[in-house]
A protein has these predicted regions:
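Acidic (Asp/Glu-rich) sequence patches and key acidic residues
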Residues: 1-157
């Protein structure tokens, strides 16, 4: 197989001539699965205890926080010259990404950004794994199970 000219340099870095590679067609989660996920997650957000509800003004904030908490996130750690610089960096980071989870510890700033769940960013298996983990934690936060939450959201739809 010959790579498209646009991807030739990338292929030369990632593959060796003469080696055999397995090609696989990526599978994507169905639209129904994605729609169900967002409906169930919205229902969980609507049922958060008051102290948690204040932290998440929208279900999108809630979803991205959950993704970070269950490990579907990118982490950037930055060591600053001082604790004050770290606090200033955290403020700047917050203005650039209001959904990021930012942790300041002394001179170190850790910025966690939720992984995108678009079909182009996550294949079927990874989406299903993230969906299950996110809904498990969301259900735990409202004192129920993922299955019970999904059934309740299904009846409301």
């Amino acid at each position: 197989m010959t790579p498209h000219p646009r991807f030739k340099a990338l292929c030369e870095r990632q593959f060796s001539p003469g080696e055999e590679y397995v090609l696989a067609v990526p599978e994507f989660a169905t639209t129904a699965s994605r729609n169900h996920y967002f409906a169930v997650l919205h229902d969980a957000w609507m049922n958060l205890p008051e102290e948690d509800a204040k932290r998440f003004p929208t279900s999108e904030y809630f979803r991205k926080w959950l993704l970070v908490k269950v490990g579907f996130a990118k982490e950037n750690s930055i060591v600053c010259d001082s604790a004050r610089d770290a606090k200033n960096l955290a403020v700047t980071a917050r203005s650039l990404d209001p959904y990021a989870v930012i942790v300041v510890s002394g001179k170190i700033v850790k910025i966690y950004t939720a992984k995108s769940q678009t079909a182009a960013s996550m294949g079927k298996e990874e989406f299903q794994a993230s969906k299950s983990a996110v809904l498990d934690l969301a259900a735990e936060m409202i004192g129920t199970t993922r299955d019970a939450l999904a059934k309740k959201a299904g009846r409301a739809a």
